């Protein structure tokens, strides 16, 4: 069931649109937030709480910070909870991480992608 998510062409198109804009150095928070909300609407029917939550936390984070301050999750989980969360906070707008975050939605059949989304969720909540 989870793999269906991004077989939804409409959601994929929106993700591609955001990624294209990022490549062209276009980072318009209001547009991105609207697109993420639309993607979230589409994905609600998947009944995948991790995905729905990740999208909501992402647009709330962007909305309140006007930037994406979450880093790419580490490959290996760090022993102490604190350093793990600190490592996932960026000092500046992290376009690379945001792009990676978006790419996770394009293939949710990969267990690691879902695990990384969970890490992003933890970092959003800790921010």
Each language-model region and where it sits:
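Short, Lys/Arg-enriched N-terminal segments with co-localized hydrophobic residues
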Residues: 1-5
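C-terminal-biased regions
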Residues: 6-44, 49-127
